[in-house]
Amino acid sequence: GSIGKVCKMLDWNSVSVDMILPATHQCDIMNFDYKQYPKDYFDIIWTSPPCTNYSQLQDCWLGRMRKGVIYTREIQKKEMNEDDRLVLKALEIIKYFNPEYWFIENPASSKMKDRSFMKELPFYLVDYCMYSDWGYRKRTRIWTNKKDFDNKLCDKKCRNMVGSRHKTNLGIYGLSQQDKYRVPEDLIISLFTE
């Protein structure tokens, strides 16, 4: 993924955990034996939890058929609770290793920000258009222990504007899921090295 590519570019070792994408450990994070690594092994930990169940867009399914059943608040709550387990596991891993820097990334509007275990964590808001030429803004929340990061929000003068609008948006068909989930290289480098 994006983080591994930047680490390789910086000539840093990286360890990845993912069920789907190629990874050092291709497994569910819930089953990952992170204690196989010494406590001082990681300088940086990055996690990008799944955002689908935390998305505001899930509300549009309420009262409608989804996956063969009427989607209800109860189903929505159950799905968010399942994803909470993943985020809590990531926080457990961060706490265990206590790296110099840790990062948890999710869209800015994600309901993850409203979960009790996230409310007290420090964060920055960034707009991907300020770190890439991908054509869309994608405001993103990055929780982190990094201090004094110079986060950039779109000033409508970024290189992704056509007139007063961004060239595209994430809702446009044609972008793959991998494209929607990627993190700009310039943002990662800024977070890791500045």
Where are these regions (language model features)?
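SAM cofactor-binding core of SAM-dependent methyltransferases
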Residues: 1-37, 43-47, 53-55
